[in-house]
Amino acid sequence: MASTTIFKNFAVAVENKSLIVISNWIASDKYKSEVEEIQSLIAQGKGKEATEKKQQLPAFTPSATFKEKRLLPNLKQYSGFVHLDFDKLTPEQMDTAFKIIATIPYTFLCFRSPSGNGLKVFVEVNTGALHHDIAYKQIQLFYEEKLAIASDPKCKDITRLCFMSYHPELYKNIRNEKFIVDAPAELEVPQQVATPVTPKVDTTTQKDFETAFGVSQSQTQKQNAFNPPLSGELEGANITELLGRV
């Protein structure tokens, strides 16, 4: 199952856990007291205190695991999940949206945010990290049309965090369908054909050779002029016979 990295105070990587495990934690009482305190502060109109309390919750990166820091160069493994956030909903909007989200076969997980007035939605895709932005935009458009509610566009970042929460009645479908992303095919890198290299002629050496060859020919011609070749009758004669005739 897809894994995520859990962070403390936004920056400190604690451990990697699967989305299944995290969903079980959210459905359990693990963060119940913290989340109920946050919602109580909001009900009292203490928004600042509620925000400070929420930021103390652990958070996880739904779309990938990271090494040490939550930066793209530190990305270790893409999870294959996109995360949507529908925030600041009325109770009626919450109820209606949750029911619709649960009927969509692409929905893997949906739970209430710690504030109690938002919904977190997790959708599995058939593409990788390279097409994360494209996948997000297509899923965002699909769910916004279904719900007639706008989602938070900041969740498009692959490094985006999601706070832990408490929602015993969350929706989870381990047999979800993958959302098929209409992504452009990756371009094939053309193979480079090696160009034959023509050896460079050393013109200086060539000229020296021609000069030397010309001198050699000239000397040979001069020698032949002073020493004409033997006549046909002398060719092949014994050297002793020749000397005897002198």
Where do the language-model regions lie?
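Catalytic micro-motifs at enzyme active sites that drive phosphoryl/nucleotidyl and oxygen chemistry
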Residues: 69-74, 98-114, 148-153
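Catalytic "initiation/cleavage/transfer" segments centered on a nucleophilic residue
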Residues: 2-10, 26, 30, 147-210
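Histidine-centered divalent-metal-coordination microenvironment in nucleic-acid enzymes
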Residues: 84, 102, 108-131, 135, ...
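Hydrophobic, Leu/Ile/Phe/Ala-enriched alpha-helical segments that form helix-helix packing faces
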Residues: 42-49, 101, 105, 139-147, ...
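Long, charged low-complexity interaction segments
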Residues: 1-3, 80, 98-112, 184-246
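Short, surface-exposed ligand-recognition loops at beta-strand->loop->(often short) alpha-helix junctions
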Residues: 85-93
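DNA replication initiation on ssDNA origins
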Residues: 1-80, 200, 204, 219, ...
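Helical (often loop-to-helix) elements that flank the catalytic cores of nucleotide-handling enzymes
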Residues: 97-100, 124-149, 170-192, 217, ...
